[in-house]
């Protein structure tokens, strides 16, 4: 006892001022001096290091050499108090340190050192985290895709894998589409989309989750596709479409449509149908458009208000009038066209995304150029636009009826100009109404929208189609659902809005700045105009 006492209390080298409830030693010495609450763990404490040396030299502090302070171990309670203070401030002033030191029975110097060490630890952790993040990001960049298409493909794979419980085809097709995206953007995409259509039937069970996953993947892909020019978007769309967004009913009808009508229909049917079911996926959106063109889908969900199209139109005017946008949006919107055009007939079948891909550049361009050349007469442009929704036009003569352009193609009016009033039967929308209504019905226009928003380029086709269809959108009163009904699919709307900066309240209703936001703030493109050729900068397609 005496030894423990002397050691802890009397030895100069070991002042107890350091130790609060537990002295500097991890294992307290023998019975602590009177003021020390901690019980001793051993009669004389466990001598360690210098302590033992000090003892050997003399019981009464003969060792005058200043000994090193023992490492302080903090109790859990002390650490809790210190951590709480550290959470509030990393640099407590002297008063705070003293207050805490009193509270936890430690010398202020220990508190100060603890804070210094804690800050160093925090910096180290941040540094490690940044390094790991940079490593992971570099890996993603290299592996996930030197090309955006890679990223989109990975996104698609993700969505597919989510869906893949239902349809392994989904994964294959979408991943196939993605992989082929760059090299054989058109064929690969169309194939993948086709598979998507086929597998969508299988995926139906996964539809919702798959659709969501597909949508997410599509969104990612779309964002990247903006960079990759549709290729990734297509695959993403295909993946999303096949991703199980299809509903079995839609799938079946779509597939049937594929069988009977233009490849466009089929592609839309396959991809679109599946999409209709899972309005979430961007691919579904595109496919939905195709399906719409084919008028195959029975889903009456969302007739698209003319205005809703206008935002898209703004985006639509992409430079890639043909090939590129054709492939991605064409897949969706172009899918329909492909069938009539005959360009992507086979390809279009799958998702409709592929369809767009196959569409010839002329066809893709034709809707816009033709319309423009024709003086904006929808009818005139329509037959050319068959590439985009030719099948729809063919099957539905109403599409051809001159609905009048929503806004003259040449119009230089600002992008923000809302499309024709949303009035269901606005004459302008007459031609479009029929087409769009059907597309909306069959293809969840919102899905289409999401696809459109998903990728600027791809959306071009899609929107182009939309534009074409759009005039007819109001033509069919029966097909046209009320604005509210249109928005009833809030999921879709919000989803689209997330990408385009529209708000549900203003989506198709008003030419608010959010409209402009589409160009400036759209998630899919920082500067959508960069993708547009001068003639395409009539953002006001609608």
From Swiss-Prot:
Disulfide bonds: none
Listed Pfam families: Homeodomain (PF00046)
SUPFAM superfamilies according to UniProt: Homeodomain-like (SSF46689)
GO terms assigned for molecular function: DNA-binding transcription activator activity, RNA polymerase II-specific; DNA-binding transcription factor activity, RNA polymerase II-specific; protein heterodimerization activity; protein homodimerization activity; RNA polymerase II cis-regulatory region sequence-specific DNA binding
Top-level taxon in the UniProt lineage: Eukaryota
GO biological process, one term: compound eye morphogenesis
Name of the protein: Homeotic protein ocelliless
Biological source species: Drosophila melanogaster (Fruit fly)
